[in-house]
Structures are given as structure tokens and as C-alpha cells.
Amino acid sequence: MPLTKLQFQPGINKETTSYSNEGGWFDMDKVRFRAGFPEKIGGWTKIGTKSFLGSCRALHAWKTIALDNYVGVGTSEKYYIESGQGYYDITPIRLTQPPNENIDVSIDGVSATGEVGEVEISLDLDEVTGQEATGEVGRVGIVTNDDVMVIVPDGFVEENDALFATGEVGEVVAGGVSVSVEGVSATGEVSVPIVAITTLVPVITFSATNGSNEITVTHAEHGAVAKDFVTFTEAVSLGGNITAAILNQEYEINEIVNSDSYKIIARQVASVADITVDGVYTPTAVTANASDTGDGGILVTGAYQINNGLETSVFGNGWGAGTWSRGTWGSSASVDLLTDTLRLWTHDNFGEDLIINVHNGGIFYWDASASTPLDTRAVALSDLAGASNVPTVASKILVSDVDRHVLAFGCNPLGSSTQDPLLIRFSDQENAADWTPTTTNTAGDLLVGSGSRIVTATETKQQTLVFTDVSVHALQFLGPPFTFGINMISENITVASPNSVISIEDSVYWMGKNEFYVYTGRVQKLPCTVRDFVFSDYNEAQAEKVFASSNTAYSEVWWFYPSADSSTIDRYVVYNYVQNIWYYGTLARGAWIDRGIQDYPIAAGLDGYLYYHENGFDDGSTAPASAIAAHIESSQFDIGDGNNFSFVSRIIPDITFRNSSTSTPSVTFTMKARNFPGGTYLQTDDEAVTKTASVPVEQFTNQSFVRLRGRSMALRVESSETGMSWRLGSPRIDIRQDGRR
């Protein structure tokens, strides 16, 4: 019999059976198609040895005016800037809690009996017990007379612990202190003694137990949840092993006791970055002794970072809903359908600076031009100079590149703090902080008229597409006086998650709840040859984790998703928009950005590391790098519809090992035989195909002799060695008919 060339149609087809898909490919992992032929995908290498805390769900790369390359990394616990293979924590501060100040005032010996608020202290006070103030009064930290701070307003002198006006009586108020003691005003002679003293009252205190490394922190209405981070300053030693240096550092909250207290694990002095090992917070604990009876002193200040988010979406309510220790004992979980949603971030550049949004949370701003930007945290956008009516909550933000407006989706309306899930607001042009519409600016808002909530939005070259849970809308810049206009372009669609949409040139691709879609001027469902395979083994409860990414070097759109039995992402499906084919594989990733600013695509592993993809040939998550197991398997093929048995005696490989780094790359060719489409493979025969020379013509195993008999056959090609790169051509087999039984 003459040799038979094995040439299969590119792409994977799982919508039918293996036998009915004769002439095609049926299964694969970590293989792509180039010009119609299968090849092993590229490898990945770690970006440095440092790691980050939490599950990464968002990446954003950009370059500053000073040519600094930055990557924004949003995780379930923090927000980092990656620079020079290090991770710099810029997570915003939710609350800074200093000691309280109890102010007592007397005028000629008459003491104040009312609230502290009856004394107004202006910021022009410049002396505290004779020393220059370094901040607001009461923050200087000077303690006299057993925890009493004496405030000396400008225009007064201190004599014998009393304050005397140095000018006219009327200048008492102008000097910075307005005093009212049950109606008694500061009147009389010039030298009226006005005494204002501040007694510092601690808000945050510590309590240690002999033999334990747990420290109980008391802070009324702290607002924290488990795994939040707080940094303490100005604490003093508890008297023993728990020194001031141990207390005055950043801590992860280990357990929430109740709304007024929580626990931390005392640890040796180190930065959180230095004790983040393989993505895990790994402190070295310090145990208290019998001398640790103090409370940390009266000057303790705590800076609380914004609450961390969930790593896994939780459905339902009541006992067991949410994460252990996120609430107090006996408290209900505030859940309607999807509670305590997954921590997602959106981020975009405003010039060289970065605007950050916690999904269904606040909007923050990071100034890349600060004197030490990597040591500077992001701040609330509303705290910027000149800020006006900045949204306090939004589901997503982006910056319109065409017209330089900041857009907030699913945000609170002007004059209200209640989130409107269908509202779009936009800032003034070129002004990220001004959101108050006036006749002289371009700030404003729009309301989407379809759906129950805005799920996501993405910018194309011409417009911004806005996705609700049932429709797609086009948001376009019109200019004054309307600024933006919006119109519906499709309804009765679905979208899997806020990150399941990707824009490539003028096309937008997205994954729905049971379909794939594309927008190229109109919305269409994408015919998918692996649709049933994907959606029949898909954990819809974790759909928020689904994300889309592009690999434009290979004309690919990738969607990463969790399989049915996994709560984390473990699979991907790829659409090649040039070849119009589909394929899939297994890979655990949390976020991905295409090459552009960086030389390679960057992806976040679930192990706390970032990786350069399409870099090398191996799995760089291990040390040393390990092999990537890659394979592709054909559908069954036969002779004459399988009426006769077939006998295969020889395989003539056709493969290239171009660019492999190992000197002897090798793949395994396996022929499988079946008698019936639903039966098991009765025989397999595999042979290694090994490269032997590359000059002048690449040489490898000429032929392999096998003995295989069955009604139908399938070909499998696989590799599991390091340094391997291969691309399959058109192998041939020596096959002949061999009877009917």
C-alpha cells in the first residue's frame, strides 16, 4: 500500500464525537496552531524572586514621563506597583486613628462643663508649650504634667501655667481660641487668664498574655475584617518581650473578636514585603512574657488599609456565608444573592498618574510624580486639591483616551451616597477631581436605560462599549454641551464577569453565560467548536473570576475560567481570530496583560508571582524550571468507513524542533487503535522521535516501525522534556486493509 499523509484540519472540535470528526483534532493541552499546524506554546519565567499577597485579579502596565516602567497589581489583599522586580504597597488608607483629645478650658478659674466641641482651635496655632508645632495641634506628641498637653495660641504668652492675652480682649478670638463656658465670655481686663489644656486619651490599646504571641488590640468601632492590614506608630513597650519596635510596624489582623477588638500575632521586626514568601504572609512570632503588662501608652496611632476582599465568591446567607471571622459571632451575613463579592479592581492612567477603583468601592489616585512615589500610598480621589463631588462608590472606572474624561460606572449620583448600578458619571475634561456639572465645565452624568446593573465597560478606538446584564450600549464623546451620548446596540445578551470582555483593535470579544460574542459594528454570537466542552465543565458560582486576555503575537483571545470541580481558575479556552479556530488547555492564572509596554505578556500566577509568558520553553514556576507537558490528539480515522480492519506498520514523522534549547529534543508519536467508536483503545504503539542534527537540514528519526491493528486509528503527539519547542507537519503512515475480523 502507498503511504498515507496525515493532515488534520486546524482547531479542536468537541461539539461532535471523535469518530464523526474524522480529519480533525479532538483533544489538546498547551498547544496552539500556527498557519494551520499545531505547535507547543511558549514557556514562562518568574519576574524576580519577590511575591505579592492575595489573589491577583488585575494588571495594568504603563510608562512614566521619566521612563519608569510600572505594573499595577491589584490583589484580594493589597494594591501594589511592580517596579524593578519588586512590589511596592500603595494600598490606600481607610482610617488613621490618633489618640483622642479632651480639651478643658477655664476663664478666671471658671471651668468648662460642656462638650469638647465648645472650644474651637484654629490651624494657625504655632506653639505648643513653647515648641513649634509640626502639624495640627495635639499631633505634636509633647506631653507635660502627667499626660497633659498645654496649647498656647498665637498672640498669647504662658505665665505660671496660665495663658494671658497680649493685646486687646477682642483679639482673644482672633488669636485662635473661641471660648464659651456656659455663657461666660472672655471679657474684662487685658490680662484675662485663659487656660486651654488637652488631655490625651488613648483610643487604641494592647493587651498581651504571658506565654502567648497573640496581642489583643482594643479599638472601638475599628471597622476592620480579618486579613486587613494596620500599621501602628507611637506605641511604647508593654514591658517585656513586646517592645515598642515590635508594636510599631505593619500587621495583618489575625482574628476579629468583635466590633471593638481584634487580634494580631506579635512578630519580629521586618517589612511585610520581606516576610511575604511565595505569596504567603510568614512572620516570625514573638511570645509575650510576664513583664508584658502595659497597654502601649496613650499616643498610639493606627493606620488601617482599606478592607481586603474575598478570594472566592460566596452565595447564600446566614451561618457559613462569607469568610471565617469577617463578622462577629452571631451576626448575619448581609447577602442578597451574591454576598461579599470577589475583590476586583479597575485602573487606568491619567497622564502618568494612576486612578484605581475597588469594584463597588471607592476611587483612589496615585501620583507618579511624587518625590518618592513608590513609598507613597494612593489617596482618595476626593482628597485631591480642588476635588468636587467625586463619586464615593463605583463598579468600574476608565479614562477616555480621546477626550480625557474620567468615567465612573455604577456610581452614586450627585448629592447622594447610594450607589445607582445603572448610572454613568464623568469628570470635567482634563480634571480628574472635578465632578460637579457647571455651565463652564464638561462634567455630567448619563443613565443607562436597560438592564439592572452595569457589569463592565471597555474602550475601543471610536467609542466605549457599556455592558449591562442584558444589553450592550455605545457611549460616544459628542462635545459640549452634552459631552457624551449613549445608545443601545444590542439586547438579550449575557456577560460572564466584569473582566470577561476584551477589546482588540475595533473588535470586542466577550464570554457570556453560555455563549461567546463578538462586536465588529454589530453584535454576533461566535460559532464555537468547544462551546459544550467549556460550559458543561464550568463553575458558574465562581464566574466573577473569568477574565479575557489577548496574545496578539499569535492572533489569540484567551479566556481563563474555573472548571466545575475547582473554585480557582485552572483552564483556558482560546479563539484565534485570524484562523477562526478554537482550542483549549489547562493553566492556573489570575490576570493577564498583553505585551506592549513590556516585551512579553505578563500573567499573575495563583502562587503570588508574576510571569513573563512566551519566554523560553519551560515552566518557570519551579526551580529549576520544569518541563511543560504538551499534547495533541486527533479524532479517529479509518479506511472505507471501517468496514475492514486496518494495519499500520510504519510511521514517517514530519516535525520541526526549531529553536529548542536542548540539544536532543524529542516528542512521542503514539498510534491508537479501536474496533468501535465507543470502545476503549485496544492497542497503542508509541515511538520517540528525536532530533539528531540541524545542519544543513534538520534531521530527526527517519521512520518508526509499529504493529497496530483496528477498525479506526488516532494519532497522539506529546512532549514532556525541558528546553523543547516543536511544530508538527504532515506525518505519514504505512497503512493497509487487513480483513474484516
Go through the PLM ranges and name each one.
Residues 81-84, 231-237, 264-269, 366, ...:
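Predominantly extracellular/luminal cell-surface or secreted proteins
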Residues 15, 94-98, 109, 113-115, ...:
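Small/polar beta-strand repeat architecture
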Residues 67-70, 352, 462:
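Structural hallmark of WD40 beta-propellers
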Residues 352-366, 373-374:
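Hydrophobic or amphipathic alpha-helical targeting/insertion segments
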Residues 221-236, 406-409, 642-659, 715:
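Beta-rich globular "head" domains
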Residues 43-60, 327-340, 373-546:
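Beta-propeller and closely related beta-pinwheel folds
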Residues 1-98, 310, 314-315, 324, ...:
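Beta-sheet repeat architectures centered on beta-propellers
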Residues 103-111, 126-131, 179-184, 469-471:
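Extracellular/lumenal glycan-associated surfaces
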